[in-house]
């Protein structure tokens, strides 16, 4: 019999970090929907302001608080839920659940854990308990021993035998894990590994070099009924984290015996931890015989379960929530197919490929090799009817400037076979591009296998693409059959045109004349074997007819955000989903085009139609030809939509909202700067970098520092502050590489200025605007800045000038829809530095802070005009809201943590408060690993910028009860100093509670900053923020814990 609790508390995952991303927005949203269907009151704790999940329609009550046990206890005390779900918020939620159990909070308030119980979670996540459980159940695990100290680890590694894999218990993204080939390797890194475990435990395991890694996803109900939903094959071998791996589903190289044996083991693993809901089980398979080991299991929704859900069309999170309530598998209907029960195991008539996306170029000193720790910030998922088609589509989806596996920058680069094989041995990201290059330069299958361990099945497929492309290159014209084969192999019009040395228009014209067009296929989870109703589609050239008839009417296509990267994350998915809902009032049919498996926008029940496919001009034109969309919306999905807006308009596509020509003016630094001059709007002095002589002349006039800004980029890509001629020329070179078609603008960098922004909506005549103020000074990228609503330090006079400037731009560019304007304010004079004619990164925050959905208002503005009489309207603030960045320094091996004009954060958290400091502290504490320092501990405060703020920070921390040291090489007046060597020793000994620093000091303090983040010690990288946070520590006892509506926020 199923349980029906009256009120359930759902724990979210907090801000996005590497290895814990938007998949938990998707899974948490589905869990909340499943609970709502049962008439259960829901309470959500999640500080991630950017998510769809933290909108009021999902949970009955929302608490935007740090996802830590003591904050959740306050909610439990107030709300008194009957049950708690901890399996839908990643490792963060599981850790909170275990803490609440161990501290007796759940028992005290009579709160029942729904789904897999705490003892099952501990069996799965403690490496030692998992190993013991597998052995007790006669399930195969690699030779291994656990350790809780450096000495024990070294002793056990000798017993197991080198090389060893060090796995970390209760851990996220493989943080701290490693392969140690020698005792010296182990000694060097074992302390970090132990520091990254929530329970201080590691497993020393025999390293299975070049074994195949596989994952199975399994559902299990309270009666023990199980369904295996997917088998996912990692192309990268053991030793590369699964989140870093290119994967395919269904698995391609297993024979039936291997598949069935591991399927049986998967069900046994689920039984051994008494799973109720969903888990994934990871296996290692010896490529030379029938030998396999169980590696680990995650007893919760995970990144791979989100992928499996989107790959198969099976709603894992929804079903898992129903099972947690006590339903049996046969009682739950698969909402995607609409006809089958959840006990049906999916069958696929297509191949899915997932590729991670890295942004390592943004980080100094970062280790570029793929290994046991996850470093990718996003992923893409493609669907095709051959491996080649699926892989090539996925490469284009990465949006890294490569047209497919072959024919791009790496393929045509000057690189020898030896160099290509060297890159492969080093396991660089996007290895398949180097595989293709190696084959082009004459490498054999065996040579590539030797350095990569990638199955020869896949290597042969990539070699086939190389051979075909090289054949294409010697053709003068292309015949119909060859063109058809090229499209079936996943070649884009751009790739084909490059091979033939023709234009893409030429290739498209031949395709149209020959009627070589893609067909639309449905994903129904059953490979067409069973009747189903579905709205989940992809395009392929490996088919003869469409699976559906296309409707007529007033239709809209919304372009999604694609794969996440630094600067494009879940906040843009919030905008896409908000637009879907708002647009349904104005259109007969709304479809979305996106390919990110982590998101809510790619869920089956959000859009009327979901096209899981590429976002580029070729694919959008294909869809318009079939669907006859009246409008295409490119403004909600971040930079990717804006990048194709102008070309779509040139091809006759009607864009919803602001015109492509206006977008081009805003995105082109030179055109935009000239427009500001024309309107008499103040901006920092600038020059377009057309020649080095011009740059020299400009710098001689304005002096250093200057800012180097490329065009058409997001997250400040290659945006740098240059303090010398040498830096300037290097930064100009890089900026020209990243955006070669557009001019680079050099502008004067205004020091010690306040940075502020306006998120807004316009109908071309009036503006609805929300002002945000940064805590850090101008020069820190807005995505890395701490923001407050309302503003604090800006004068009313400055804000009124900002509003006048915004209104002038809205009217001049005829802005219709959402926008964001960034200012630096010095001596009460605002200077515009940027205009984005799209939904912005901060829009979920500003919307939720003011209680007004700017995307809804954007649709009103486009179709009906804004409904207020003033030229410019800003809704009043009832309380304070503060947004803080989440950095993932600890995942990015070796990188130097510092802040500048190029974005480095991976996520954001926000909180509300009755004072600025109430909101600030809860927001800052929401980002991992931030915490309140233990009194009587040590703080390090030093730097070469914002010295007055650093000194006041130190004074506040002394008042709070810490012993504060500055560093003798960078002394602060009145603060006790120690030398750098002593400071490094204190950090390594984990005696330091917090580090507050400012400036770029890599040659001086690399070891301090790096060791601090490796050991999970909070680090504040800006003196102004350090001052405000240290002041907030003094008011720690007066934090408030209200539901979002009580602060007047939420939408």
From Swiss-Prot:
Annotated positions binding Mg(2+) 4: 834, 836
Gene3D superfamilies attached to this UniProt entry: 3.40.50.20, ATP-grasp fold, A domain (3.30.1490.20), ATP-grasp fold, B domain (3.30.470.20), Carbamoyl-phosphate synthetase, large subunit oligomerisation domain (1.10.1030.10)
Coiled coil region boundaries: none
Essential cofactor(s): Mg(2+); Mn(2+)
Listed EC numbers: 6.3.4.16, 6.3.5.5
Catalytic activities: hydrogencarbonate + L-glutamine + 2 ATP + H2O = carbamoyl phosphate + L-glutamate + 2 ADP + phosphate + 2 H(+)
Region (Oligomerization domain) residue spans: 400-548
Binding site residues for Mg(2+) 3: 822, 834
GO molecular function, a single term: carbamoyl-phosphate synthase (ammonia) activity
Top-rank taxon, per record: Archaea
UniProt note: domains: The large subunit is composed of 2 ATP-grasp domains that are involved in binding the 2 ATP molecules needed for carbamoyl phosphate synthesis. The N-terminal ATP-grasp domain (referred to as the carboxyphosphate synthetic component) catalyzes the ATP-dependent phosphorylation of hydrogencarbonate to carboxyphosphate and the subsequent nucleophilic attack by ammonia to form a carbamate intermediate.
Protein's name according to its UniProt entry: Carbamoyl phosphate synthase large chain
Organism for this UniProt entry: Saccharolobus islandicus (strain L.S.2.15 / Lassen #1) (Sulfolobus islandicus)
């Amino acid at each position: 019999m199923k349980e029906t609790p009256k009120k359930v508390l759902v724990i979210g995952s907090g801000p996005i970090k590497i290895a814990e991303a938007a998949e938990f927005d998707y899974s948490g949203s589905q869990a909340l929907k499943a609970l709502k269907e049962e008439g259960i009151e829901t309470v959500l704790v999640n500080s991630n302001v950017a998510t769809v999940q933290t909108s009021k329609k999902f949970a009955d009550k929302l608490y935007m608080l740090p996802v830590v046990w003591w904050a959740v206890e306050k909610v439990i005390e107030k709300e008194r839920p009957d049950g708690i779900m901890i399996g839908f918020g990643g490792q963060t939620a599981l850790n909170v659940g275990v803490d609440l159990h161990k501290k007796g909070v759940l028992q005290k308030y009579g709160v029942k854990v729904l789904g897999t119980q705490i003892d099952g979670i501990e069996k799965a996540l403690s490496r030692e308990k998992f190993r013991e459980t597998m052995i007790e159940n006669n399930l195969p695990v690699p030779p291994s021993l656990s350790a809780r100290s450096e000495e024990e680890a070294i002793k056990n590694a000798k017993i197991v035998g080198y090389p060893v894999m060090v796995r970390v218990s209760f851990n996220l993204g493989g943080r701290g894990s490693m392969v140690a080939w020698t005792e010296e390797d182990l000694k060097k890194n074992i302390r970090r590994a132990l520091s990254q475990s929530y329970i201080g435990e590691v497993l020393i395991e025999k390293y299975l070099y070049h074994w195949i890694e596989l994952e199975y996803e399994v559902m299990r109900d309270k009666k023990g009924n199980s369904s295996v939903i997917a088998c996912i094959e990692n192309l990268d071998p053991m030793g590369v984290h699964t989140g870093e791996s290119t994967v395919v589903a269904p698995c391609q190289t297993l024979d039936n015996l291997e598949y069935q044996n591991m399927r049986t083991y998967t069900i046994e693993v689920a039984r051994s931890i008494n799973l109720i809901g969903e888990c994934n089980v990871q296996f290692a398979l010896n490529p030379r015989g029938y030998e396999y080991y169980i590696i680990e299991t995650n007893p919760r929704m995970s990144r791979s379960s989100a992928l499996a859900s989107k790959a198969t069309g099976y709603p894992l999170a929804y079903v898992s929530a129903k099972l947690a309530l006590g339903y049996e598998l046969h009682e739950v209907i698969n909402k995607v197919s609409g006809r089958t029960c959840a006990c049906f195991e999916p069958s696929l008539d297509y191949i899915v490929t997932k590729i991670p996306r890295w942004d390592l170029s943004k980080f100094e000193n970062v280790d570029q090799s793929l290994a046991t720790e996850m470093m990718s910030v996003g992923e893409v998922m493609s669907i095709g009817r051959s491996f080649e088609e699926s892989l090539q589509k996925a490469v284009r989806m990465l949006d890294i400037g490569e047209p497919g596996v072959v024919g791009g920058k790496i393929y045509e680069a000057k690189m020898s076979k030896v160099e290509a094989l060297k890159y492969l041995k080093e396991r660089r990201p996007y290895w398949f591009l180097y595989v293709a290059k190696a084959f082009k330069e004459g490498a054999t299958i065996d040579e590539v296998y030797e350095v990569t361990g990638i199955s020869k099945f896949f290597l042969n497929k990539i070699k086939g693409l190389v051979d075909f492309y090289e054949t294409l290159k010697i053709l003068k014209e292309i015949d119909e059959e060859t063109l058809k084969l090229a499209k079936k192999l996943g070649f884009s019009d751009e790739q084909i045109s490059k091979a033939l040395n023709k234009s893409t228009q030429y290739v498209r014209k031949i395709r149209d004349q020959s009627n070589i067009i893609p067909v639309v296929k449905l994903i129904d989870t059953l490979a067409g074997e069973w009747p189903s109703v579905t709205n989940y589609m992809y395009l392929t050239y490996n088919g003869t007819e469409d699976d559906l008839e296309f409707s007529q009417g007033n239709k809209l296509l919304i372009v999604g955000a694609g794969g996440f990267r630094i600067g494009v994350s879940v906040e843009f998915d919030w905008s896409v989903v908000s637009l879907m809902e708002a647009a349904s009032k104005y259109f007969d049919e709304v479809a979305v085009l996106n390919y990110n498996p982590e998101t809510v926008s790619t869920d089956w029940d959000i859009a009327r139609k979901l096209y899981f496919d590429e976002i580029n001009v070729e694919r959008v034109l294909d869809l318009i030809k079939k669907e006859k969309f009246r409008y295409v919306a490119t403004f909600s999905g971040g930079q990717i939509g804006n990048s194709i807006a102008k070309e779509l308009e040139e091809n006759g596509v009607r864009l919803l909202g602001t015109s492509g020509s206006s977008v081009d003016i805003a995105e082109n630094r030179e055109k935009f700067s000239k427009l500001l001059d024309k309107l008499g709007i103040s901006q920092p002095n600038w020059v377009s970098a057309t020649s080095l002589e011009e740059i020299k002349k400009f710098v001689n006039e304005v002096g250093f520092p200057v800012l180097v800004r490329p065009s058409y980029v997001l997250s400040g890509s290659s945006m740098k502050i240059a303090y010398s001629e040498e830096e300037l020329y290097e930064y100009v070179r890089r900026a020209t590489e990243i955006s070669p078609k557009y001019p680079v603008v050099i502008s004067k960098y205004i020091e010690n200025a306040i940075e502020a922004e306006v998120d807004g909506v316009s109908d071309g005549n009036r503006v609805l605007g929300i002002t945000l103020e940064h805590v850090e000074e101008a020069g820190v990228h807005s995505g890395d800045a701490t923001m407050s609503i309302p503003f604090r330090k800006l004068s009313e006079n400055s804000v009124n000038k900002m509003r006048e400037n915004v209104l002038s731009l809205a009217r001049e560019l005829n802005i219709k829809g959402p926008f964001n304007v960034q200012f630096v304010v010095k001596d009460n004079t605002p200077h515009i530095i940027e205009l984005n004619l799209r939904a912005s990164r901060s829009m979920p925050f500003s919307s939720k802070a003011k209680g007004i959905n700017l995307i809804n208002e954007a649709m009103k503005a486009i179709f009906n005009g804004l409904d207020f009489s003033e030229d410019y309207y800003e809704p009043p603030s009832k309380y304070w809201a503060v947004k803080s960045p989440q950095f993932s320094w600890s995942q990015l091996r070796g990188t130097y943590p510092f802040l500048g004009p190029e974005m480095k954060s991976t996520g954001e958290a926000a909180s509300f408060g009755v004072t600025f400091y109430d909101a600030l502290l809860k927001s800052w504490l929401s980002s991992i690993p931030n915490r309140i320092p233990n009194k009587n501990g040590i703080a390090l405060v030093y730097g070469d910028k914002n010295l007055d703020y650093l000194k006041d920070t130190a004074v506040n921390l002394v008042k709070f009860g810490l012993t504060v040291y500055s560093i003798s090489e960078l002394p602060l007046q009145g603060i006790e100093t120690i030398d750098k060597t002593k400071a490094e020793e204190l950090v390594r000994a984990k005696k330091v509670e917090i580090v507050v620093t400012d400036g770029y000091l890599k040659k001086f303090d690399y070891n301090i900053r790096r060791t601090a983040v490796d050991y999970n010690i909070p680090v504040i990288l800006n003196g102004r923020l350090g001052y405000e946070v240290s002041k907030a520590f003094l008011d720690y006892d007066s934090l408030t814990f209200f539901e979002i509506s009580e602060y007047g926020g939420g939408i």
